[in-house]
Amino acid sequence: MTAEQTKRFKYWQWRTIIGTMIGYAIFYFVRKNFSFAIPGLTAEYGISKTTFGVIMTLVGLIYGVSKFVNGVLADRTNGRWHMVTGLSVCSVINFIFGCGAIICAWITGQTYGTTFIHTLVVLFGVLLILNNMFQGCGFPPCNRLITHWVPPKELATKMSIWNASHSIGAFIIAILCGYLMGHTGTDMTGDPEMRQRVVENTASITEKMNAASAEAYVTNALQHVGAWQWTFWVPAAIAVLGVIFIIVTLRDTPKSVGLPELEGTKTQLDEHDSSEEFKAFLRKKVFLNPMIWGLAVADFFVYIVRFAVLDWGPTFLQESRGLSSSMAGWTVAIFEVCGITGMLLAGWISDKFFGGRAQRTCVFCMAGVILFISLFFALPESTDPVVLLMMLAVAGFFIYGPQALIGVIASNHATKKAASTANGVVGMVSYVSVVVSGWGFGFISDHFGWRWVFITMIAMAVLGFLVLLSMWNTKSDGYEHDAAETN
């Protein structure tokens, strides 16, 4: 490239990274908002957590399959328009979510009662499945875009920066939905019928509280009846703005803005190859590539540990270590913040010291996970809460390295022509982990106690460590390098 081309390329490279970060964070706005509506739906309609739990487990599996399907599509489509399609549909679905009670009232002719609630649950279940099918249009096209704009030797560092979009999106939507649930809705504290309904629907929650806390909980729900609707409508509106932002900001490949393609990313394919040649390339680089399947298995174990801490950490700290719900809740925030730090450092180390061989960084990270989860488990019940949180925080620091880098390794080995398909395979396998981390650990905790939850978690981390260790000497990417490049 000429000096002018290099300057333009850097501009478009960072424009693509930042644009996809913002775009993907907005996908989180219309995906992670549902959990904030659950307390309102429970109070107003009595929908149980068990019902929500079954739906959310199914949704996690659907999302994993969607990442695979959209990964295959992303390698053959324009990344910008792929994202636009997915986010547009998700914004419409979220608007329908907010109108769910109105739609069910129109269908059933009722505003409450068994038939109405069953209809509402079915509607929400269908919408959640559809929403997560189109949520799969988020990461795969982002991955395609970035692998076309970032050289393999820089991908670990810059993809680690990009991966912060997950936490940024989750952080902002938590603040936004928390505000909406506390400042919108209709005040119905003076309606005795609604009060009786809320008292009955929240009985399983308030029975564990003292009288003053129970009254405050019920009163808060009555002051914000219908607030849950705004946790869908406002993110849906933001998603519409996000669609416009993506259209204006992103372009598909360097060639689309008059720039040459990345050096050092030569493959057996070019843009004129036939469909049959592309399928053969996918078979070689993805479906029959033991490296991709090894990474998928490793990511399965990584996700088990990550989701176990996020889903069960606060509960364990309250039940087994006697922490308050407020203190236990900080575990998720601290885990995420330290995870971002670990993710950025892991990416930099991979490129700086291991020449892009990110699997070596992952090995050290998994060793850290094993060490600090084991230390956390071994601490006595009398341990200071700050020490407990520090142990989990350091575990988060280490676990987010592999969580980000496994996708980078898959992209480099499948090459930019099949990166999204490879990440789709890895993502699909990793999301099967929700069965173990969700239902599995819940079952183990109920029947065998927390001790065996942690023993199982540590065993999963060890297996992930061994799988990644077996890849130690694997080359850094799957591109066809000239002799001059490899010397």
Describe the residue ranges of each PLM region.
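Extracytoplasmic gate region of multi-pass secondary transporters
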Residues: 34-38, 289-344, 403, 437-438
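Residue-level signature of mid-helix packing/kink "hotspots" within the transmembrane helices
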Residues: 32, 60-68, 136, 170-171, ...
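Cytoplasmic helix-loop-helix junction between adjacent transmembrane helices
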Residues: 127-166
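Glycine-rich segments within core transmembrane alpha-helices of 12-TM secondary carriers
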Residues: 156-185, 339, 427-437
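C-terminal ends and interior cores of transmembrane alpha-helices
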Residues: 88-117, 367-381
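C-terminal transmembrane helical hairpin of 12-TM major facilitator-type secondary transporters
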Residues: 356-406
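Cytoplasmic membrane-interface "Motif A"-like loop-to-helix N-cap segments
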Residues: 76-87, 352-366
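Juxtamembrane intracellular "pre-TM" segments in multi-pass secondary transporters
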Residues: 2-10, 257-294, 320, 486-487
